[in-house]
Amino acid sequence: MSKVEVKKLAAITGHKDCIYTLARGGTSQLFYSAAGDGMVASWDLEAPENGRLVAKLDNSIYALCYIHEAGFLVAGHNYDGIHFIDTAKGKEKASLKLTDAAIFDIQYYRDLLFVATGSGEVIVIDWPNVKIVRRLKFSDKSARTIAVNPVDRHLAVGYSDAAIRVFDLQTYDLVNTIDSHTNSVFSVCYSPDFKWLLSGGRDAHLKVWDVEKDYVAYESIVAHMYAINHIVYNPSGSHFVTCSMDKSIKVWDASTLQLLKVIDKSRHAGHGTSVNKMLWTSYNDQLVSASDDRSISVWDLNFNPSHFE
């Protein structure tokens, strides 16, 4: 493995249960977290020790989405619906009852929110008017993860039936079904140039799909010992990271798909349990990770170190 210098910048605590999700905020140094304790917190990478409680919901939260145009944070309230939170005032602006199931992911594109649910539905919402536009039901198994491709106008959704389904962003027609994994798909992620779709899930395989060739399989890598929970690129698109139930974060070269670094507890004071979600910020390219161990870690990754560890 090539040398990548890893430095742990901060260990953030405050949540009282497993931390399931992260979302970027209105500026590069701001981000949000939510957990099994129903708490939504705001953090500043310039002073990561000073968290701020933004909202407290009754049930666990698996999904957050920040809408930049409105300055609102959308929280997926499991077994209920979504809550629109004015983060500046720390007040709820609106809510929408959606489902009795869990809400696993929320993404947005222009005036639309896409919500992945445990019932297998992907619910399309007109967020400025807080109303349901469409319910896409193509599986009885959970819809777990969503990625938006504005170039090809595609919406990729990973399901617990091991398939990735690709929908047209305008018509909501199903345009492709990828028999992708042997078990649940937990993460789908487009490359920043939208030429590749990466996926990972319970089978611990990292899969790469060629978008320009109608999502033909390009590569399959046994990437982790246990389930891959999340995949995210750095802002420039030169590298990406995967995180897993095996407690590790792995750093990859995006062009060669070469594994560059393993970040874990023994070598880097990493997480002690499953790493659930990551956020690669544009604030000094810092990487943020959240875990079942109730902590958030902030990392600096140097790909051009002047000296080796």
Describe the predicted segments one by one.
Residues G26-T27, H68-E69, Y108-R110, P150-V151, ...:
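Residue-level detector of Asp-centered blade-edge/turn motifs that repeat once per structural unit
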